[in-house]
Structure formats: C-alpha cells, structure tokens
Amino acid sequence: PDRIVVLPGYPAVFVELKTITGRLTSLQRVQLKRLKDMGQAVRVLHGEHEVKLFLEECKEKLRDGV
C-alpha cells in the first residue's frame, strides 16, 4: 500500500492510491488480499475525488471522537 492511515481509536487503514484509470498490478492484488485475509482494512482510491472523500471520512471520525 502507498499509505497507512492511523486514527486514534480506529483500526489502521492500508490505502493504495491510483489515478482515475489506474489499475492494481498482480502483486498489489496479492498483497492487498493478504492484508484483507488478516482482517485488515484496505482501501483502493482512484483519483483526487476519492482521496478527498476518504479524507472527509477521516475528519468525521476525528470530530466524532472515540
């Protein structure tokens, strides 16, 4: 993953960033599946819009607190 997002009181999220038309490589698919199989939160975000939406989700969690 490109980023690991850690917020207080929430599980870590492994984030893969792609362009709008970007695709996961076969190795990325394998690694993300391994993380999911271990019960980890995994997100693949395509383009700036999805990144902004994800950041808004994070901000909401921080505002709501634990």
Predicted regions and their residues:
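Catalytic phosphate/metal-binding cores of nucleic-acid and nucleotide-processing enzymes, i.e., regions
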Residues: 1-66
